[in-house]
From Swiss-Prot:
Transmembrane spans: none
Enzyme type, top EC level: hydrolase
Protein's name in the database: GTPase Obg
Molecular function, one GO term: GTP binding
Location in the cell: Cytoplasm
Residue ranges constituting the Obg domain according to the UniProt record: 1-159
GO terms, biological process: ribosome biogenesis
Binding residues annotated for GTP, in chain numbering: 166-173, 191-195, 213-216, 283-286, 314-316
Keyword Ubl conjugation: no
Name of a matching Pfam family: MMR_HSR1
Species lineage: Bacteria, Pseudomonadati, Pseudomonadota, Gammaproteobacteria, Vibrionales
Gene that encodes it: obg
Length: 390
């Protein structure tokens, strides 16, 4: 199945049903009190994570989704039926962004997780709600509110522990083939990898982690060159980044400049991603003598002023790959789990437009008055007497 990690959809929550103006009518009761019922709430729209899905391709062909409208109220204090909700299944790791506001509406990280993305409209109030000691025959009602309408951008972010980045043909796909059972395409031309791929790596002590391989970056990727930076989003949830550097590029380019290009593109994309722990992987060391490879690596480290961890590997022959994986597994055990701060929670809170609707309705806003009850006269309503035969 084709891998699709981004789709745009439009969701319409159901409108609320209207309240109704009605009065109690039956034999021998000519002027009963108000009995207009409320409308029903509109249906909501939800996203639910499903571990059996791994692509958003279904939402490329069907972009519009509507929840059911609430039914109107009726006489006899009958409340209208609530509209049916609609639930859209998406892969685990999907997030939803409101295109108009840019806010993150939902982020689904575990199987079965369910979040609302569009709230149904509130029900309208029937005239029974407006009766009082001074208004015994209210002709007021309120209409149901419109349901939320949102245009959402669905983004599928791979859930991986380790993310790989580098220029095309740096050896990222060869590395993931060497350390896992994943088999991404490998060839001697740029952009062999067109979509991200995942591999499960086994390390010592029965430890394991997931590594993600994304298409290569080139200079100007932040401005759309090559495949752009659209796949960098898959690194946002990674805990460690592996920056693969080809110490002997086939095109004769400078490894130092190549490394700086990747760092620059990463920083332009996101400071948060750029600040993640990042290790350098010097690949294709088997193409040079050991002394020459060490000399080349030291030159690169000095030019980058690099003081963090780095490893020398030859992915095609799997030289140094197992030691690297063991070190990665041990290092990730020392990393703290990400905990969302109160500020981040507040920033991610979604404010819906209908939160204060009922308060506004009862205060007199959006009240509709029906004047078609001319046969009713408040002045004449002094109660009525029911005669009961003994």
């Amino acid at each position: 199945m084709k891998f699709v990690d981004e789709a745009t959809i439009k969701v319409d929550a159901g409108d609320g049903g209207n309240g109704v103006v009605s009065f109690w009518r039956e034999k021998f009761v000519a002027k009963g009190g108000p009995d207009g019922g409320d409308g029903g709430d509109g249906g909501d729209v939800y996203l639910e994570a499903d571990e059996n899905l791994n692509t958003l391709i279904d939402y490329r062909f069907n972009r519009f989704y509507n929840a059911e409208r609430g039914k109107n109220g009726s006489g006899g204090n009958c409340t209208g039926k609530r509209g049916e909700d609609i639930t859209l299944k998406v892969p685990v790791g999907t997030r939803a962004i409101d295109i108009d506001t840019g806010e993150k509406v939902a982020e689904l990280m575990t199987h079965g997780m369910k979040q609302m993305v569009a709230k149904g409209g509130w029900h309208g109030l029937g005239n029974t709600r407006f009766k009082s000691s001074v208004n015994r025959a209210p002709r007021q009602k309120t209409l149901g509110t419109k349901g939320e309408v949102r245009e959402l951008r669905l983004e599928l972010l791979l859930l991986a522990d380790v993310g790989m980045l580098g220029l095309p043909n740096a050896g990222k796909s060869t590395f993931i083939r060497a350390v896992s059972a994943a088999k991404p395409k490998v060839a001697d031309y740029p952009f062999t990898t067109l979509i991200p791929s995942l591999g499960v790596v086994r390390a010592r002590g029965n430890k394991s982690f997931v590594v993600a391989d994304i298409p290569g970056l080139i200079e100007g990727a932040a401005d759309g060159a090559g495949l752009g930076v659209r796949f960098l989003k898959h690194l946002e949830r990674c805990r460690v980044l592996l920056h693969v550097i080809d110490i002997l590029p086939i095109d004769g380019s400078d490894p130092v400049q190549n490394a700086l290009t990747i760092i620059d593109e990463l920083e332009q994309y996101s400071e948060k991603v750029a600040s993640k722990p990042r290790w350098l992987l010097f690949n294709k060391t088997d193409l040079l003598l050991e002394e020459e490879a060490d000399e080349k690596i030291n030159e690169i480290l000095e030019a980058l002023a690099w003081e963090d961890r780095y490893f020398k590997i030859a992915a095609v022959s799997r030289t140094g790959t197992q030691e690297l994986c063991d070190e990665l597994a041990d290092f990730m055990d020392t990393l703290p789990k990400e905990i969302q701060t109160e500020e981040e929670k507040a920033a991610n809170k979604v404010d819906f437009m209908w939160d204060d609707y009922h308060k506004d309705a009862m205060s007199g806003k959006d009240v509709v008055t029906e004047d078609d009850w001319d046969d009713w006269d408040d002045e004449e309503d002094d109660g009525h007497v029911i005669y009961v035969r003994d």
